[in-house]
Amino acid sequence: MRCGSLCRFLWLWSCLPYIEAMPIQRVQDDTKTLIKTIITRINDISPPQGVCSRPRVAGLDFIPRVQSVRTLSGMDQILATYQQILTSLQSRSVVQIANDLANLRALLRLLASAKSCPVPRARGSDTIKGLGNVLRASVHSTEVVALSRLKAALQDMLRQLDRNPGC
């Protein structure tokens, strides 16, 4: 039993020189490209008929306001919140954006691990209290505000990635 484990370990050890790690710059470039793709998808979604693109709606405090986030874990936390909001909207137009946010979060975790940062952990669903009530009252307004703020947050993240964010 021990000999078999040792043989497998030595065989894997001999393969290590041939395994190439993904360059961090390539991961960062993929992250920037995905952010630009998500921004393009948001731009392609036109607001529903009769809804202002910059509405002033009360009760949408759970949607993060635009603020500069300088850490990878902070970016992951904001994206987790937006992903949860978009998933709750159950709108066909935002399904792909929600999936893209999941992929973007995975790329940010890969960047964090390449920098030897602790793996970012998003907080639980308590960040979006009362979302169901707001969705029943104003689904379209919530979607417009969420996409508008997400777009601004992604543009800020794009700038921060150029500055090499910390953990």
Curated annotation (Swiss-Prot):
GO process terms (BP): activation of protein kinase C activity; bone growth; cellular response to leptin stimulus; energy reserve metabolic process; intestinal absorption; leptin-mediated signaling pathway; lipid metabolic process; negative regulation of appetite by leptin-mediated signaling pathway
Primary residence: secreted
Signal sequence, start to end: 1-21
Superkingdom in the source lineage: Eukaryota
Keyword Disulfide bond: yes
Record-annotated disulphide pairs: C117-C167
Keywords for the protein's UniProt record, in alphabetical order: Disulfide bond, Obesity, Secreted, Signal
Family statement drawn from the similarity comment of this UniProt entry: Belongs to the leptin family.
Function of the molecule: Key player in the regulation of energy balance and body weight control. Once released into the circulation, has central and peripheral effects by binding LEPR, found in many tissues, which results in the activation of several major signaling pathways. In the hypothalamus, acts as an appetite-regulating factor that induces a decrease in food intake and an increase in energy consumption by inducing anorexinogenic factors and suppressing orexigenic neuropeptides, also regulates bone mass and secretion of hypothalamo-pituitary-adrenal hormones.
Identification of the protein by name: Leptin
Species: Halichoerus grypus (Gray seal)
The organism's taxonomic lineage, starting at the top: Eukaryota, Metazoa, Chordata, Craniata, Vertebrata
Gene: LEP
